[in-house]
Structures are given as structure tokens and as C-alpha cells.
């Protein structure tokens, strides 16, 4: 019989989907297991027969399914306002590019967000965060990018820090100052990139407000040369990088981000084989964002088969934002990734666990149920992981465990 230490907590009689690629079974499934949690981490995984049937801090899950906590590795959670009117315009035939050129798009949200009080932004973002937590999310990336000036970018990152301080969910904050050219720099995008590189990145990094730098390399964002200036600045300071690339056209953004060993290349609908090979060589994760593909009614799908062939890890995220993916649901994103992009349900699960952890640089501590990893996991009223992907309108979450505590 396995001896437990004072303070240990046990979840026994579980069906465990470890998402450990070293396990032979689909989803890393093993039955009749028990998790021993100690000081917020998984201490051990043992057959339940090795543990007492009952006792203090022993939770009998009656055969329920347990998976790693979900990870949403790409969100724009902190913003004010909405862009419902733009959606109507698109339904009537206007393109995303046309709306952006008319001062809509990202800059419309920038105006609303700049005018919004920090406390109001916090309350809006907190409600969104808790919606994701209710689906079993335990690690969440939050980008800035709706300030496009030093003061408001800092305000957004302070909101992310305040959310993290609640200890309800892990937050990975990302500086996305290179999201769009603000109205005041409309005729001088290079001048805005200078502001990003010489002021925003170094000052906000010095304050410890973000973990990585992101950018939007696209015809409605920044060109390759401008994007490279951002990457060079970040890497010179030792900051991890990532990028929104190849969403609406093929500019070579994935190759660029991969050349700087980017954590991830996101969207990638127009990615070509050269870009896929570069991602493999750079150790860059491909992040699929099916919500934006759906909402923009795009037709160019990411090259999933090429990503498989080159063994590029593929993550899936909600891309929750007011303009192109107003879906605050990672379950829905998983379903869309399967239906629209052809992922298998197991690939979708890998995309919101171990591959999503890699996209945030957290692969050594998050995204799998393994000894030594963080005790972030979810107990489901389900028999198979596929059920969560199959029926996104139903949430079978039974229990969410964060840092070893039921939350």
C-alpha cells in the first residue's frame, strides 16, 4: 500500500487521459488510476489498488474522465466595445480589408479601449476569463494590442496582471503593440514601429508586464521589414516572440518568425511548404484559429496535411476578440478545428494541452498529466475525451483543479 504524506491529496477511481505522447493509447488513456497531488504539483500516478479507498483528502471520482487543464494560447481578452456593426457590413459584402481601410477593424476597438477606464476593462475581462475557466481552462494567454500607444498598452497589461493576481487561472501576457498602425500614425507606419521598438518594448519589458512579443505581419498590419524590426528588438532583449502570419495572404511571415525561433506562428491559412519547413526547423508551433476563419467566411484553409508531414506541433485557440472571433469558448474552437480544418479529435485535444503549452513556452510544466507537472486538471462527466469536442454546446465539466485545489 502506498504511503501518503500529510497534506497529500488524492483523486482516485479515475479514467485518465494524460495527453502524454509516450503513452501508447489514444489520448494517453489509462483506466483505474489515482493521482497524488503534493504542493500544487502531480507527485505520482499509481494504480488505485495501491491507495486506501477512503480517508482525508481522498476524492473518489467514480470512474470519471480526467484530462489536463485546457490551455487557450491565443486570446485578445482585454478590450472595450464590440464590432457588431462591422459584422453586418461584412455580411452585406464588405471585406475585412475594406473595413480596416475605412478606419474600422482594430482601430475601432482601439478608440473604445483607450476611452475605457481601467477598472471597467478589468471587470469586462474578468467575466470573459471566468467563462473560459468554466470550460476547464487553467492557463490563458492574453494579448495587449488595443492601445497602440504606450499608456494604453500598459493599461491593458496591468489588467492582465490584475487578473493573474486573483490566482484563479494562470495568465501568460503578450505585448502586441505591433497589431495595427494607429490613426495618428496613419501616414507613417515606420514611425509607429520606431515607437514600438524604441519605447514600448523596452519600457514595458523593464516593468515585467509581459512574457513575449507578438506582431501582425499582413497587408492590413505590417510588412516583413517592419515586422523584422520588432523581432530584432525583442530578441536583442532576450524576449520570446510569436506572430500573426499568413492569415489573409502569403507574405513569408511564418518563415520570418521561425528564423527568430518564434514560439508560434498563428492563423497560417496561407502558409506554404517553405513556411512549414521553416517552422519545423525553428521549433515553432502552428496555432490554428478556426473561429476567425469561420467568422470572416474565409475559404483558404491551413495546410494541415503539410504540418503533419513535417511534424510541426499544432495548437488550437479561441482567438477571442471583438472583430474576427467573438467566441469565448475553447470547446467550440476544438470542434471547429475538426470540422473545418480536418483535425482529429485527439489532435484537437493535443492542440489545447501539450502543444498549446509549447506555444507559450510552458511545455515543461503544463499540458500533460505527468509526475512533476503542475496539478492543473479537469474531471469530466464523460467517458471519452471526444465527447467534449463533439458537443460544444454542452459542458460536462464536473470539477476543475487548479494548482492542486478544487476551484
Swiss-Prot record:
It is found in: Cytoplasm. Signal peptide: none annotated. Pathway: Amino-acid degradation; L-histidine degradation into L-glutamate; N-formimidoyl-L-glutamate from L-histidine: step 3/3. Fe(3+) binds at residues 74, 76, 244, 319. GO terms for biological process: L-histidine catabolic process; L-histidine catabolic process to glutamate and formamide; L-histidine catabolic process to glutamate and formate. 4-imidazolone-5-propanoate binds at residues 83, 146, 179, 247, 324. Zn(2+) binds at residues 74, 76, 244, 319. Its cofactor is Zn(2+); Fe(3+). Pfam families: Amidohydro_1 (PF01979). One of its GO terms (cellular component) is cytoplasm. Binds 1 zinc or iron ion per subunit. It is an enzyme of class 3 (hydrolase). Keywords: Cytoplasm, Histidine metabolism, Hydrolase, Iron, Metal-binding, Zinc. CDD domains: Imidazolone-5PH. GO terms for molecular function: imidazolonepropionase activity; iron ion binding; zinc ion binding. PANTHER family: IMIDAZOLONEPROPIONASE, IMIDAZOLONEPROPIONASE-RELATED. HAMAP family: HutI. This is Imidazolonepropionase. It comes from Salmonella typhimurium (strain LT2 / SGSC1412 / ATCC 700720). The gene is hutI.
